[in-house]
């Protein structure tokens, strides 16, 4: 079970939002590179970087910071989302040392882009599905689409994405607990790993997610709980390793 610290970037700073609202942010650090180094030292094997400004702008805004993090941690698996709308952006990130590009809004607006990206960058494409009450949200969560979560996941699984990152918007940044039931339901419906995101708030939830690993839950992204020290990463990694019975790498 992968446990993946989140670094959300807004205005060049490391922030956390509540339910994806850009106006409801908390700044945790003015130095995202130092934050990334901290999580690496604590044992993280993968980092989840989100260009929040880019998600709304439709193109990278905080790319320079992401490049600096990738350069500082050449052995770290880094996944990046936010503002990825064309293959040139994916290529630039991969050339900079990023391991995975997360396609979200573009997948809904132009489904063929996912298939094309999987062919052009095999093994490097993740699908980010952000949902509220089972419906997919796009454009930095500012717009709710008519698309059903599981239907969309099954469609894009066939295109060759490596994994799906599922975020329950209503739980994100609220410290109310990850939606294990919905995450497990999604994981059972497809044959690629699902990475849980949104609301992970305690070690108990980490344990519960690990118990659903056989359903296809391959990891969890942790944000506010780490920054507010509700969860200590090293302790969480030890629990995940013990319950998974194998390395969390």
Swiss-Prot record:
InterPro entries: Aldolase_TIM, His_biosynth, HisA_bact_arch, Isoase_HisA-like, Isoase_HisA-like_bact, RibuloseP-bd_barrel. It is found in: Cytoplasm. Pathway: Amino-acid biosynthesis; L-histidine biosynthesis; L-histidine from 5-phospho-alpha-D-ribose 1-diphosphate: step 4/9. GO terms for biological process: L-histidine biosynthetic process; L-tryptophan biosynthetic process. Keywords: Amino-acid biosynthesis, Cytoplasm, Histidine biosynthesis, Isomerase. One of its GO terms (cellular component) is cytoplasm. It is an enzyme of class 5 (isomerase). Gene3D superfamilies: Aldolase class I. It holds the Pfam family His_biosynth. Belongs to the HisA/HisF family. This is 1-(5-phosphoribosyl)-5-[(5-phosphoribosylamino)methylideneamino] imidazole-4-carboxamide isomerase. The gene is hisA.
């Amino acid at each position: 079970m992968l446990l993946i610290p989140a670094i959300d970037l807004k205005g060049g700073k490391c922030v956390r939002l509540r339910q994806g609202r850009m106006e409801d942010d908390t700044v945790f650090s003015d130095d995202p590179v130092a934050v990334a180094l901290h999580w690496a030292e604590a044992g993280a094997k993968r980092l989840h970087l989100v260009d929040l400004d880019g998600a709304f702008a439709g193109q990278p805004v905080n790319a320079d910071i992401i490049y600096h993090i990738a350069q500082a941690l050449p052995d770290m698996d880094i996944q990046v989302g936010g503002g990825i709308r064309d293959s040139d952006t994916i290529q630039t990130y991969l050339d900079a040392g990023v391991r995975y590009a997360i396609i979200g809004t573009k997948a809904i607006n132009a489904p063929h882009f996912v298939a094309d990206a999987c062919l052009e960058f095999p093994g490097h494409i993740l699908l980010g599905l952000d949902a509220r009450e089972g419906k997919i949200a796009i454009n930095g969560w500012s717009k709710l689409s008519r698309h059903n979560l599981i239907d969309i996941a099954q469609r894009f699984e066939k295109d060759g994405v490596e994994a799906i990152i599922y975020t329950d918007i209503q739980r994100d940044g609220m410290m109310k607990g990850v939606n294990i039931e919905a995450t497990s339901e999604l994981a059972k419906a497809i044959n690629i790993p699902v990475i849980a995101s949104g609301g992970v708030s305690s070690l108990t939830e980490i344990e519960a997610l690990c118990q659903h690993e056989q359903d296809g839950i391959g990891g969890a992204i942790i944000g506010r709980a780490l920054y507010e020290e509700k969860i200590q990463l090293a302790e969480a990694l030890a629990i995940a390793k013990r319950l998974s019975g194998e390395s969390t790498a």
